[in-house]
């Protein structure tokens, strides 16, 4: 290899590393936003359930049997949202670990 070839190789690697870092940073930001979104969804769902239960129990002579089905449906939704939240947090943790490794490798070079 000539010095120019080495220089081009180093520049290419440098650009690849910068692109990977930018992608990692973007992915981290997206996962943080996902986590905030899923937490907000869970909060609003739980608040809605509490309000439904409160409204139903205060109305006299109205059967509460539909409430049981609604609670099961909402519970399934909450479990799904919690799973999505866990998935997003796991992805964020993985991306943060990858980013830390990338920065460590860059510092050694």
From Swiss-Prot:
GO biological process: cilium assembly; flagellated sperm motility
Keyword Chloroplast: no
Record's GO cellular component terms: acrosomal vesicle; axonemal A tubule inner sheath; axonemal microtubule; nucleus; outer acrosomal membrane; sperm flagellum
Entry function: Microtubule inner protein (MIP) part of the dynein-decorated doublet microtubules (DMTs) in cilia and flagellar axoneme. Forms filamentous polymers in the walls of ciliary and flagellar microtubules. Required for normal sperm mobility.
Annotated localization: Cytoplasm, Cytoskeleton, Cilium axoneme; Cytoplasm, Cytoskeleton, Flagellum axoneme; Cytoplasmic vesicle, Secretory vesicle, Acrosome outer membrane
Subunit structure as annotated in this protein's UniProt entry: Microtubule inner protein component of sperm flagellar doublet microtubules. Interacts with TEKT1, TEKT2, TEKT4 and TEKT5. Interacts with CCDC38.
Coiled coil: none
Protein name, UniProt field: Tektin-3
Organism: Mesocricetus auratus (Golden hamster)
Keywords: Cell projection, Cilium, Cytoplasm, Cytoplasmic vesicle, Cytoskeleton, Flagellum, Membrane, Ubl conjugation
Family as reported in the entry's similarity comment: Belongs to the tektin family.
InterPro entries: Tektin-like, Tektins
Lineage top rank: taxon: Eukaryota
PTM description: N- and O-glycosylated.
Membrane topology: Peripheral membrane protein
């Amino acid at each position: 290899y000539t010095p120019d070839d080495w220089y081009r190789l180093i520049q290419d690697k440098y650009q690849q590393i910068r692109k990977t870092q930018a992608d990692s940073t973007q992915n981290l930001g997206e996962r943080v936003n996902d986590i905030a979104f899923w937490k907000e969804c869970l909060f609003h769902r739980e608040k809605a359930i509490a309000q439904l239960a409160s409204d139903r129990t205060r109305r006299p002579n109205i059967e509460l049997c539909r409430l049981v089905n609604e609670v099961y449906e909402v519970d399934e939704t909450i479990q799904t949202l919690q799973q999505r939240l866990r998935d997003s947090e796991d992805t964020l943790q993985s991306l943060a670990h990858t980013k830390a490794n990338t920065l460590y490798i860059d510092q050694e070079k």
